[in-house]
């Protein structure tokens, strides 16, 4: 039994992750998708060929149940092709990084797996090389910066931002803060290749007017610091690029409270038994170029969105179903409606 097709390292979970396995004689092929972080089952072994296909492994039992992420069976075949992405997407969990400027763990944002192949009821015959897959909808080649926002950005005083780097080796990020004619630089290093989260906290650079974040071959992001507005709301969201993006909406246009009461009617008239309250806030962006508005439009389909206040990220829901990203002959801003993840329920009787 032989693996004839294996996805590339750090392929995106938003697309297909197709494997293929073949055997000489027709028969059943059992496929098991195993969490590599849980460790291979004892007795399983395999050697990857130079082109990424995998030779037969030594006899052994399949991985334990705690490591099993999914399974498939193909009946009476010599070849089997399958997509494992649907089994893995639910394993990715995004939590925005918190803390000071520097690299932070990307825990939960990638999934590393082996795929095992065996005849039904038999020992494992082939094991694919371990592959790490990342969130996102499009392929990217390291080294690169995973983002849907432009590389020149505005950021309010005291705010934070997050950069997602895909590296092919050690990476050094240098942050240069400019204040008038004075410049100060700090360097941060990640020793290993892979997916890295770099957080920029402007509280570490209180007097900066501009900041340049130079990640070497991954790319450079330039920030212009603007005054913070008291009524501004900073949103963070999981983007199609597989990153967490941030943007401060300077205008809070409306805030509406809606309540639905459940009532009973008795001798004394109507009596409120319970009430459900929902609060919806409409935010308006600054007048932005097309690239920023396209990135903000992802909010309408983002699987996870938060309101960012310092190191506190509060999950919210997006109530808007559409976003206008261009109007002929005029600059455009974008309106987005947000609401709490849960309604407030009150019982009176």
Question: Model-found features: residue ranges?
Answer:
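Extracellular/virion structural assembly segments
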Residues: 2-20, 24, 56, 153-168, ...
């Amino acid at each position: 039994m032989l693996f004839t097709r294996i996805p590339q390292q750090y392929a995106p979970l938003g697309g297909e992750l197709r494997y293929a396995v073949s055997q000489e004689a027709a028969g059943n092929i059992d496929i098991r998708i195993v969490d590599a972080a849980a460790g291979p089952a004892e007795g399983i072994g395999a050697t990857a060929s130079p082109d990424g296909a995998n030779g037969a492994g030594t006899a052994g039992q399949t991985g334990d149940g705690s490591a099993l992420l999914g399974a498939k069976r193909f009946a009476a075949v010599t070849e089997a092709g399958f997509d494992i992405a649907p089994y893995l997407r639910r394993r990715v969990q995004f939590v925005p990084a918190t803390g000071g400027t520097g690299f932070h763990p990307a825990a939960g944002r990638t999934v590393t797996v082996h795929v095992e192949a065996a005849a039904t009821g038999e020992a494992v015959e082939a094991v694919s090389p371990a592959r790490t897959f990342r969130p996102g909808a499009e392929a990217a080649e390291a080294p690169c910066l995973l983002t849907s926002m432009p590389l020149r950005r505005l950021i309010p005083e005291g705010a934070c931002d997050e950069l997602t780097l895909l590296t092919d080796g050690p990476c050094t990020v240098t942050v240069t803060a400019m204040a008038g004619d004075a410049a100060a630089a700090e360097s941060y290093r990640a020793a290993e290749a892979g997916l890295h989260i770099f957080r920029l906290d402007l509280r570490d650079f209180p007097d900066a007017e501009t900041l340049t974040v130079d990640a070497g071959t991954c790319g450079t992001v330039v920030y212009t610091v603007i005054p913070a507005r008291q009524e501004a709301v900073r949103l963070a969201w999981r983007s199609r690029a597989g990153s967490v993006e941030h943007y401060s909406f300077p205008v809070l246009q409306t805030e509406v409270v809606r309540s639905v009461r459940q009532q009973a009617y008795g001798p004394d008239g109507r009596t409120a038994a319970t009430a459900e309250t929902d609060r919806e806030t409409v935010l308006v962006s600054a007048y932005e170029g097309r690239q920023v508005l396209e990135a903000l439009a992802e909010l309408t389909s983002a699987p996870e969105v938060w309101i960012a206040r310092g190191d506190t990220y509060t999950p919210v829901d997006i109530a808007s179903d559409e976003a206008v990203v261009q109007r002929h002959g005029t600059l455009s801003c974008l309106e987005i409606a947000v609401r709490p993840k849960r309604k407030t329920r009150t019982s009176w009787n």
